Amino acid sequence: LPKQGKRTDWERYKAWVLELGVMPTKRDIVLAFPALYARHYRACLDYAEALLPSVRLTEGTPRFGWQANAAADVSGAAHDRRINFVVDPTGNSGKSWFCKWCLTNFPLETQVFRIGKRDDLAYAINIEKTIFLFDIPRGQIQYLQYSVLESMKDRMIFSPKYESSFKILKSVPHVYVFTNEEPDMNALSTDRYKVIRVPSGVVGGPGLTP
C-alpha cells in the first residue's frame, strides 16, 4: 500500500469496509472510492479480504482416508512438480467438502476453481495463494485446462486478458484436482501426476473411513 499521501484515503476505506461487514464487489469500491480503485484496484481487494473475518463454510476435521492425507499435505511444503488428482467415480466422498474445509481453515492461502477457459483462469489466479483446488463437476473433465495446472506448478502464468501480465507466484503451490473421471494421462509429463482413487462406498464429510 502507498506509504505517503494516501493515509487518509486508506483509513476511510478501512472504516468503510469494516462497516460494510462483507467483502465488497469491484462495483461497490468503484462507486465509493473511484480514485483509490483506479490507482490500486488489486490492493483494495486484498486489503478488504485481510480486514474481514474469514467465513466458516464447514465444520469438522478430516481424520481418516484421503482427506486426512490431503489435509496433512496442504499443511506443509508443496512438491515442486506434482499435481494431485483425486478421482471418485461414485461421488459424494467429500471432495467439495474438502474445498470448503480448506477455504475455512486456510482462507488466505486457498483459491478454488471450477471449469473455465484458459485465459479466464489465468486472469483469476491470485499470486499470493499457495493452495489451488479445482472442483470439477461430473462429466466436465475433458474441459480441464492442464496447461494452467502446469503453469501453477512452474510458478509462471501468462495472463493475456484485459491488461496483459506475466504473473509469478510467491511460492510453489499445492495443486489438487477433484473429479469423478480419470484425468488425461497424456496431457502432462508422467512425473506430474499423483492420482488418488477414492474407494467405492466412502461417504463424504469429515471423519471418512479409509
Predicted regions and their residues:
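P-loop NTPase catalytic core of nucleic-acid-dependent motor ATPases
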Residues: 1-128, 133, 137, 196, ...
